[in-house]
Amino acid sequence: MDEGFILSNKYRRVIFDGLASGETNIDRIAKKHRIIPHVAHKIAEEFINGGVLEKKENKYVLTEEGKKLSAKISE
């Protein structure tokens, strides 16, 4: 997955930025940014399938690839 995929959609960008800032709860990110929870979870699944995110217990955590993308996007 590349940064263009994340940046091409405003909801993906918001959720990715929330996860990159250390938040581990998708529902909390969705509520904060007024995103429909179902949409937020669908985006999280896209990130998991793309290898950027992993789910540990009930928390979502960026993978090493996700951390590299975060650094690249924030430049």
Task: Label each residue range with its predicted role.
Residues M1, S74-E75:
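Short intrinsically disordered terminal tails
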Residues M1-I15:
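Short alpha-helical segments that sit at the start of domains
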Residues L7-S8, I35, L62:
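Alpha-helical hairpin
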Residues A20-N25:
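Short capping segments at the starts of secondary-structure elements
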Residues R28-K32:
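A short acidic, leucine-rich amphipathic alpha-helix
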Residues R34-I48:
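Short amphipathic alpha-helical interaction segments
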Residues I48-N58:
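A short, conserved structural fragment
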Residues K59-I73:
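Basic, amphipathic "hinge/linker" alpha-helix immediately C-terminal to the N-terminal HTH DNA-binding motif
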